[in-house]
Amino acid sequence: MNTPFNDGSGQTDPMTDIPTPLIFTDNAANKVRELIEEEGNNDLKLRVFVAGGGCSGFKYGFTFDELISEDDTVMEKNGVKLLVDAMSFQYLAGAEIDYQENAEGAQFIIKNPGAASTCGCGSSFSV
């Protein structure tokens, strides 16, 4: 399907006036770009996925991928492509993918309003 989605602005799609379903922040896109530059492979894209497991039933995952699958939703922000497979996308609708650095460390964070509960570390959730 390779459907484009939110530009990360948190705004509505001007063509449909429907809220954008996924937000990819500037902080996250810029950090991914840094990591891709460190790897020296401009074909890399960030894949975000949901898998069974974790203390709350589902867990988030991040990996680099060179290939775009037929059922992926593809988003580009600041020159970085984000991939989400169709199954994972249904659990990530309305979520924000961000990167934060603080006194506790640095990490990618998913703020998911569709999650009924999350674990303390924020890496797993339930619906």
UniProtKB/Swiss-Prot annotation:
Domain of life: Bacteria
Organism ancestry: Bacteria, Pseudomonadati, Pseudomonadota, Betaproteobacteria, Nitrosomonadales
Biased composition (Polar residues): 1-14
Function, as annotated: Required for insertion of 4Fe-4S clusters.
Residue ranges of the region described as Disordered: 1-20
One Gene Ontology MF term: iron ion binding
Full protein name: Putative iron-sulfur cluster insertion protein ErpA
Subunit structure: Homodimer.
Cofactor: iron-sulfur cluster
Species of the source: Nitrosospira multiformis (strain ATCC 25196 / NCIMB 11849 / C 71)
Keyword Ligase appears in the UniProt entry: no
Family per similarity comment: Belongs to the HesB/IscA family.
GO biological process: iron-sulfur cluster assembly
Comment on bound cofactor: Binds 1 iron-sulfur cluster per subunit.
Pfam families the UniProt entry points to: Fe-S_biosyn
Keyword Iron-sulfur (UniProt): yes
Keywords: Iron, Iron-sulfur, Metal-binding
Residues bound to iron-sulfur cluster: 55, 119, 121
